[in-house]
Design a protein with these regions (language model features):
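Conserved helicase RecA-like core
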Residues: 1-166
Length: 166
């Protein structure tokens, strides 16, 4: 009998991973461009802080997009309501922190966008694992600022996968 344990840094083969070099000031413009050109059913956008999730969700709503924030400051019932709206198609974009999105399983999620690069490689794997589930194809996009170049390399080494540049 042979028992193998999957590494915590394994990513699904169903997920196409891409990155985009972007300076901090131009992230919102880059996001707007992606939302214009990518065909998506539902998307999770990961931001590093609770405040950033709220701010980004408000900016997307101001552009007429069905977006909402989800973070650790929200009551559990409110988080569940927001996730329910995503499942039902009333929302198309969820802007989340890592903690708020742990274990999130919504079939509609076709895209995961890392607006802020995660602090560690394991978080990256957890984030992009919200798409490409149950045999479906998924898209993972990572924004990388010039000083985050090293983290991009660390993610590629940990996942043993080259992430293609957009």
């Amino acid at each position: 009998v042979e028992v193998t344990i999957a590494s915590k840094t394994t990513t699904s083969a169903n997920i196409r991973q891409r990155y985009w070099w972007v300076s901090g000031m131009h992230k919102l413009d880059a996001l707007t461009r992606i939302l214009e050109v990518e065909t998506f059913d539902a998307m999770i956008i990961f931001a590093r802080t609770k405040a950033a999730t709220e701010e980004l969700a408000e900016k997307l709503q101001a552009r007429g997009l069905a977006a909402a924030a989800i973070n650790g400051d929200m009551q559990q019932a409110q988080r569940e309501r927001t996730i329910g709206q995503l499942k039902e198609g009333k929302l198309d974009i969820l802007v989340a922190t890592d903690v708020a999105a742990r274990g999130l399983d919504v079939e509609r999620i076709s895209h995961v966008l890392n607006y802020d690069i995660p602090y560690d490689t394991e978080s990256y794997v957890h984030r992009i694992g919200r798409t490409g589930r149950a045999g479906r194809k998924g898209e993972a996009i990572l924004f990388v600022t010039p000083r985050e170049r090293g983290m991009l390399g660390a993610i590629e080494r940990a996942t043993r996968q080259k992430i293609e540049q957009m």
